Amino acid sequence: MLQGHERSITQIKYNREGDLLFSSSKDQKPNVWYSLNGERLGTYDGHQGAVWCLDVDWESRKLITAGGDMTAKLWDVEYGTVIASIPTKSSVRTCNFSFSGNQAAYSTDKTMGQSCELFIIDVRNADSTLSEQTPTLRIPMTESKITSMLWGPLDETIITGHDNGNIAIWDVRKGQKVVDSGTDHTGVINDMQLSKDGTMFVTASKDATAKLFDSETLMCLKTYKTERPVNSAAISPILDHVVLGGGQDAMEVTTTSTKAGKFDSRFFHLIYEEEFARLKGHFGPINSLAFHPDGKSYASGGEDGFVRVQSFDSTYFENIFE
C-alpha cells in the first residue's frame, strides 16, 4: 500500500517497463513510486490545484499533467523540474503522449463560459517557450466535453470519450471527426484504456458498464455489467481478463465498510463477460486502475487517497475457464 497523497487519487499509470508507477491526486502533487518495493522516489511540485490526469512518455523522460489550476505542465521525469507550463482558459481534464513521444494532446473543460477544446502540441524540443507556441492542432468540441482520451495507432488519430457517453475518433492531420460510436454508453465515460496491441480499448462509464471497443471502427465487442458506476477499467496484457473498479459517486458515499462489496476490484473474462473474482481493499470508490506491463500484478488508486499494488498468486494464472 502506497501512502503519499493527502486527498483522493485521480489517476495512476505505469511507465512502459513497469519499474515506475505515477500517481496524481486532488492534493496538487503528482508522485512517482518504485513499483517493486513501493518506495516513493519523488513528487512533482508546481500545480496550484487538483491534478486530474497524467501520462508518461515511451522512454520515461517526460511527464505531462493536467491541472485544475488551468495549466498543463510538462515535467522532466528524472529531475522533477517543470520543462514547460501551458496556460489554458479552463481546467485541463485529460492529457496523453503519442506513441512516438513527439506529440502530446490535452483537453480543457467546458466551464466558466469556455467551450471544451482539444489541443495537440509538439514536444520534441520542448522548453519554457512551449507556452507561447501555437498548438499544432486545436479542435473545439461543440457538443459535449471530453472526459477521457487515447491516441490511436500510428499517432494518426485520437479517440475521445465524452460526458454524454459518446465516443469519437478524430483525424489528427485534418482535425475532423472520422468515426462516431453513437449511443453505446448512456453515462459519462470516466476512463478508457488500450489493450497491449492497441487493437481494442475498454471503457468505464457511469452507466454501470464497461465495454470493449474496436480501436478503428468503434464497434462494441463486449459488455461487462455491474450494479454501480464504473470509474476505471483495464485490460490484462497477458491474459483475457478485464479489471473494473468503481463504486458510488464520492459525494454519495456514507459508509466506510468494505464488507458491502461496493468498492472491490472486479475481474471479468474478456471474452465470456463473466465475473470470476473480486478483491477488496479500498475504503471508498476506486478511481483508477492499471495493470503492470508484465501482467503479474495490478495497482488501484482510490478516493481514500491510497494506491494499492497487488500481486497475483499462482492460482490466478492457472484459472482456466471451462
From Swiss-Prot:
Major subcellular location class: cytoplasm
Ranges for the WD repeats: 4-43, 46-85, 141-180, 184-223, 281-322
The entry's keywords: Cytoplasm, Initiation factor, Protein biosynthesis, Repeat, WD repeat
Keyword Ribosomal protein listed: no
Gene3D superfamilies noted in UniProt: YVTN repeat-like/Quinoprotein amine dehydrogenase (2.130.10.10)
MF (Gene Ontology): RNA binding; translation initiation factor activity
Any single Gene Ontology cellular-component annotation: eukaryotic 43S preinitiation complex
GO biological process, one term: formation of cytoplasmic translation initiation complex
InterPro entries registered for this protein in UniProt: eIF3i, WD40/YVTN_repeat-like_dom_sf, WD40_repeat_CS, WD40_repeat_dom_sf, WD40_rpt
Compartment(s) where it occurs, according to its Swiss-Prot or TrEMBL record: Cytoplasm
PANTHER family: EUKARYOTIC TRANSLATION INITIATION FACTOR 3 SUBUNIT I
Quaternary state and interactors: Component of the eukaryotic translation initiation factor 3 (eIF-3) complex. The eIF-3 complex interacts with pix.
Protein task: Component of the eukaryotic translation initiation factor 3 (eIF-3) complex, which is involved in protein synthesis of a specialized repertoire of mRNAs and, together with other initiation factors, stimulates binding of mRNA and methionyl-tRNAi to the 40S ribosome. The eIF-3 complex specifically targets and initiates translation of a subset of mRNAs involved in cell proliferation.
Stated family: Belongs to the eIF-3 subunit I family.
Protein name: Eukaryotic translation initiation factor 3 subunit I
Lineage of the species this protein comes from: Eukaryota, Metazoa, Ecdysozoa, Arthropoda, Hexapoda
